[in-house]
Amino acid sequence: MAQVTYNGTGRRKNSVARVRLVPGTGKITINNKDVVDYVPFANLILDMKQPLTITETTDSYDILVNVNGGGFSGQAGAIRHGISRALLTVDPDFRPALKSAGMLTRDPRMKERKKPGLKKARKASQFSKR
């Protein structure tokens, strides 16, 4: 018998996360590694689990994630966004709680591009009046 899965795609900065929720015990696997082995910061792990705590489904689903692009912070945001979208396919009644917490909104902030004549996006060389 095929197991029931719920899918969601999340994006943040340059990261894209494809999330699958499978009924289980709350184990999170990212790119075939345990979440503690993959993410070195505890605050990012809590950030990823936020949609689950809001909907009180922390121990109800195993989460399988395939994520690529960006750094740890961007990937954590993409995973959070993907989990939120997957939870909507589980139960559409989660929408008001997730939306009021801002979990369903794609964060549009991106890295600003480097401008010609400047050292970084906004950093210029020191100005000399004379």
UniProtKB/Swiss-Prot annotation:
GO biological process: translation
Renumbered residue ranges of the record's region Disordered: 99-130
GO CC annotations on file: cytosolic small ribosomal subunit
One Pfam entry name: Ribosomal_S9
GO molecular function: RNA binding; structural constituent of ribosome
Keywords annotated in UniProt: Ribonucleoprotein, Ribosomal protein
Bias kind Basic residues: ranges: 111-130
UniProt family annotation: Belongs to the universal ribosomal protein uS9 family.
PANTHER family: RIBOSOMAL PROTEIN S9, SMALL RIBOSOMAL SUBUNIT PROTEIN US9M
Designated name of the protein: Small ribosomal subunit protein uS9
Species, as recorded: Latilactobacillus sakei subsp. sakei (strain 23K)
Gene name of this polypeptide: rpsI
